[in-house]
Swiss-Prot record:
Changing residue 150 to F: No effect on activation by increased osmolality. GO terms for cellular component: plasma membrane. Changing residue 301 to L: Strongly decreased betaine transport. This is Glycine betaine transporter BetP. Belongs to the BCCT transporter (TC 2.A.15) family. The gene is betP. Changing residue 153 to D: Changes substrate specificity, giving rise to proton-coupled choline transport. Decreases sodium-dependent betaine transport. Residues 581-595 have a biased composition (Basic residues). It comes from Corynebacterium glutamicum (strain ATCC 13032 / DSM 20300 / JCM 1318 / BCRC 11384 / CCUG 27702 / LMG 3730 / NBRC 12168 / NCIMB 10025 / NRRL B-2784 / 534).
């Protein structure tokens, strides 16, 4: 294995036929800026993607430790349920008590970091060759990233979260406050999750398609730890943590989906009281479906399913909007956005010491859980975003990833959460016994034609999970094969089975507290990866700072500054010469008059 510069330049320029200074070269480029684009486009033809040339051999040093952890979790959770559940609860308490502040702080740091990157000169850099066109159409690109990023979460929490905050209140606020309920929900589901995904996705996309490294999370750390470090034990540890976070994050989604589909079957009177075997059956069907989708390839399976998801989700949202309290939803939407913006920093600063020290338990169940869930999803969502974003500029990537899903989430929660709150205000509560997985179907069945829409909702839950798990298993296959862009289908399928095993373990070991068990284990599994995402920020900035476009931009700025100084000096000399000339003319004129 050959070593290379830990900060490789993404573009290699040919030697110049004659020696000229950077200032002279930039002067010529300023006179004809199209020369710069042509020069960089020619040079970028030399980019070689290591991931495309790497043999599809299995990386056992990454696979074995990850599988050992998965198998140990399954054996522990199924064979010793009480011990496993107690450990998960104790570990959660330790994380929230000692590292809750880190989740809260860096969750918001990630948002500001990615916004600054988009607004900076880095935003013009393309994720690939300078003339490379995007691989997917914009509509398909948006639908794929949204379905992979949080589709099933919107289905599960879209109704129950705003209603819960409205009924029970939020630390530091009274109950029955619509503005606080909606703004807190938006805080959890708009900018913060997608900022995390954008950081991971951008780091991988730049490293892979711009610089030409392997499509591995560890490869994005080359600017910090060097090529040897990325290929050594530290790089392997990063990839192992990425796989573990992905398995548990996806398993949490599988668990939520299975619980809610079971509730839908009960609400439709298909199965009166879903048993553990019903849940096993649901998980098995979903697992087979997403494995089939994954092995069909990203260009086919995920794209088709994602487009279908968007159609079904739009149909469901339009139904609730039209048949439900339309005017109330329209009134709620701008108010929710205003409350979110005005209370952003107050919500971002909420810690265990808030509300006279009573907010800790609430944060562990909501904000910290969400931040951990997004972080656990970030390896596979980030890598998936990278795979579908080749050819787009950094600014286009960030704006698309950050704003479009955030806007859709805002509309979704306003429709479903707003409708649930209006029902509550009118004395037609859908709260039931407080089971979160039942409330979406309670809302739908309270509307005319809701029985049919309930069936569509169950189908949508399944397809949303399939797209998410499809992305996750494909990405885990890539990480298991040295960054191979097209992972072996059987490796992909194996990780799908492992994810299903973890999901069933968390559901069955939790018993009546299955949802809490899912949340607890997700937070614990995601904690190590928080520090990986923090490190990615530094690696990304160092990588971007060595991009030739940015370096040319800095050189151009220096040239412009030197040129401006020279102009000032020249103008000053010119002023002095003119002043001296006027003095001589006045002196000569005075001498002529005396004669």
């Amino acid at each position: 294995m050959t070593t290379s510069d830990p900060n490789p330049k993404p573009i290699v320029e040919d030697a110049q036929p004659e020696q000229i200074t950077a200032t002279e070269e930039l002067a010529g480029l300023l006179e004809n800026p199209t020369n710069l684009e042509g020069k960089l486009a020619d040079a970028e033809e030399e980019i070689i993607l290591e991931g495309e040339d790497t043999q599809a051999s299995l990386n056992w040093s990454v696979i074995v430790p990850a599988l050992v952890i998965v198998l140990a979790t399954v054996v522990w959770g199924i064979g010793f349920k009480d011990s496993f559940t107690n450990f998960a609860s104790s570990a959660l308490s330790a994380v929230v008590d000692n590292l809750g502040w880190a989740f809260i702080l860096f969750g918001t740091v990630f948002v500001f970091f990615i916004v600054v990157i988009a607004a900076s000169k880095f935003g013009t850099i393309r994720l690939g060759r300078i003339d490379e066109a995007p691989e997917f159409r914009t509509v398909s690109w948006i639908s794929m990233m949204f379905a992979a990023g949080m589709g099933i979460g919107l289905m599960f929490y879209g109704t129950t979260e705003p209603l819960t905050f409205y009924r029970n209140g939020v630390p530091g606020h009274d109950e029955h406050n619509v503005g606080v309920a909606m703004s807190t929900t938006m805080f959890h589901w708009t900018l913060h999750p997608w900022a995390i995904y954008a950081i991971v996705g951008l780091a991988i996309a730049y490293s892979t398609f711009r610089v030409g490294r392997k499509q591995l999370l560890s490869s994005a750390f080359v600017p910090l730890i060097g090529e040897k470090g990325a290929e050594g034990w530290l790089g392997k540890l990063i990839d192992i943590l990425a796989i573990i976070a992905t398995v548990f994050g996806t398993a949490c989604s599988l668990g939520l989906g299975a619980l809610q589909i079971g509730a839908g079957l009960s609400a439709a009177n298909i199965i009166e009281d879903p048993s553990d075997w019903t849940i096993v059956g649901i998980v098995s069907v979903l697992t087979l479906a997403f494995i089939f989708s994954a092995i069909s390839g990203v260009g086919k399976g995920i794209q088709y399913l994602s487009n279908a998801n968007m159609v079904l989700a739009a149909l469901l949202a339009i139904f609730v909007f039209v048949v439900g309290p339309t005017v109330s939803i329209l009134n709620l939407l701008p108010g929710s956005i205003g409350n979110y913006l005005s209370n952003f920093f107050q919500m971002a600063g909420r810690t265990a010491m808030s509300a006279d020290g009573t907010a800790g338990e609430w944060l562990g169940s909501w904000t910290i859980f969400y931040w951990a869930w997004w972080i656990s999803w970030s390896p596979f969502v980030g890598m998936f975003l990278a795979r579908i974003s080749r050819g787009r500029s950094i600014r286009e990537f960030i704006l698309g990833v950050l704003l479009v899903p955030a806007g859709v989430s805002t509309v979704w929660f306003s429709i479903f959460g707003g409708t649930a709150i209006v029902f509550e205000q009118n004395g037609e509560s859908i709260w039931g016994d407080g089971a979160a997985e039942e409330q979406l179907f309670g809302l739908l069945h309270a509307l005319p034609g809701g029985q049919i829409m309930g069936i569509i909702a169950m189908i949508l839950l399944g397809t949303f999970f399939i797209t998410s798990a499809d992305s996750a298993s494909t990405v885990m296959g890539t990480m298991s094969q040295h960054g191979q862009l097209e992972a072996n289908k059987w490796v992909t399928a194996a990780w799908g089975v492992a994810t299903a095993a973890i999901g069933l373990t968390l559901l069955l070991s939790g018993g009546d507290n299955a949802l809490s068990n899912l949340q607890n284990v997700t937070i614990v599994a995601a904690t190590p990866f928080l520090f990986v995402v923090i490190g990615l920020m530094f690696a990304l900035v160092k990588d971007l700072s060595n991009d030739v476009i940015y370096l040319e931009y800095r050189e151009q700025q220096r040239f412009n500054a030197r040129l401006a100084r020279e102009r000032r000096v020249h103008n000053e000399h010119r002023k002095r010469e003119l002043a001296a000339k006027r003095r001589r003319e006045r002196k000569a004129s005075g001498a002529g008059k005396r004669r």
